[in-house]
Swiss-Prot record:
<dbReference type="InterPro" id="IPR011060">
    <property type="entry name" value="RibuloseP-bd_barrel"/>
</dbReference>
<keyword id="KW-0368">Histidine biosynthesis</keyword>
<keyword id="KW-0413">Isomerase</keyword>
<dbReference type="InterPro" id="IPR023016">
    <property type="entry name" value="Isoase_HisA-like_bact"/>
</dbReference>
<dbReference type="GO" id="GO:0003949">
    <property type="term" value="F:1-(5-phosphoribosyl)-5-[(5-phosphoribosylamino)methylideneamino]imidazole-4-carboxamide isomerase activity"/>
</dbReference>
<dbReference type="InterPro" id="IPR044524">
    <property type="entry name" value="Isoase_HisA-like"/>
</dbReference>
<dbReference type="GO" id="GO:0005737">
    <property type="term" value="C:cytoplasm"/>
</dbReference>
<comment type="pathway">
    <text>Amino-acid biosynthesis; L-histidine biosynthesis; L-histidine from 5-phospho-alpha-D-ribose 1-diphosphate: step 4/9.</text>
</comment>
<dbReference type="GO" id="GO:0000105">
    <property type="term" value="P:L-histidine biosynthetic process"/>
</dbReference>
<feature type="active site" description="Proton donor">
    <location>
        <position position="129"/>
    </location>
</feature>
<dbReference type="InterPro" id="IPR006062">
    <property type="entry name" value="His_biosynth"/>
</dbReference>
<keyword id="KW-0963">Cytoplasm</keyword>
<keyword id="KW-0028">Amino-acid biosynthesis</keyword>
<dbReference type="GO" id="GO:0000162">
    <property type="term" value="P:L-tryptophan biosynthetic process"/>
</dbReference>
<dbReference type="InterPro" id="IPR013785">
    <property type="entry name" value="Aldolase_TIM"/>
</dbReference>
<comment type="similarity">
    <text>Belongs to the HisA/HisF family.</text>
</comment>
<dbReference type="Pfam" id="PF00977">
    <property type="entry name" value="His_biosynth"/>
</dbReference>
């Protein structure tokens, strides 16, 4: 199982939100580059970055920070948030990003998504964020009428190889992942799944590993120290 320490960017800082609420923001580190270096130092093999400002604005607003992170670490970095054109995708790749995560565009601009997948194949990940089972977009501010399962099936037909699935109600809560929704997703599509939201303990990670989930994104648990990064990396390596 792959472990993805998370860095959420807002106004150039590393923050955490609670259940996706921008008003419930906690600054975890004023210097996201330093945070990325810390994660790498403790053994992280890859990083997950979300441009929260970009997710709302529809364009990357923390590109300079992302570029500095990519230059500061030697591990692969995947980035999501506000990526809604091929130009935006190419710009991120040009500054050193390894993979990009498309969310809103996956629902509302299938032509762009198909072009991106055709050009960059496994480098394109789709992020599916669900609120009560329905897909949320534009920084989780809007909720659509399409279920997360239906969107995942559409993504599979297009050729998407990896999905990041987030249950928004779990995000930032340390309440444990939504195992039921993940199990249903696993039964519905044959795509690699990265679980996000609510992971609070080594036991949570072990449960997801036992389910053969490809990867897990860990945010608040690392910052609050309910999960030790070195320990979880060792545990998943042995599984």
């Amino acid at each position: 199982m792959e472990i993805f320490p998370a860095i959420d960017l807002k106004e150039g800082r590393c923050v955490r939100l609670y259940q996706g609420e921008f008003s419930k923001e906690t600054v975890m580190n004023e210097d996201p580059v330093a945070q990325a270096i810390i994660f790498e130092k403790f053994g992280a093999k890859r990083l997950h970055i979300v441009d929260l400002d970009g997710a709302v604005a529809g364009e990357s607003l923390n590109l300079s920070v992302i570029e500095r992170i990519c230059k500061a670490v030697r591990i692969p970095v995947q980035v999501g948030g506000g990526i809604r054109s091929l130009v935006a995708v190419e710009k991120l790749f040009s500054v050193g990003v390894d993979k990009v995560i498309l969310g809103t565009a996956a629902l509302y601009d299938k032509t762009f998504l198909e072009e991106a997948v055709l050009l960059y194949k496994e480098k394109i990940i789709v992020g599916i964020d669900a609120k009560n089972g329905f897909v949320a977009t534009r920084g989780w501010l809007d909720v659509s009428e399409i279920s997360y399962i239906d969107l995942a099936k559409q993504m599979e037909k297009i050729g998407v190889q990896t999905i990041v699935f987030t249950d928004i109600s779990k995000d930032g809560t340390l309440g444990g992942p939504n195992v039921e929704q993940l199990e249903l997703l696993q039964k519905s599509v044959a795509i690699r799944l990265i679980a996000s939201g609510g992971v609070a303990s080594i036991q949570d990670v072990k449960k997801l590993n036992d389910m053969n989930i490809y990867g897990v994104i860990i945010g608040k648990a690392l910052y609050e120290k309910t999960i030790d990064l070195e320990e979880v990396l060792e545990v998943t390596k042995l599984c």
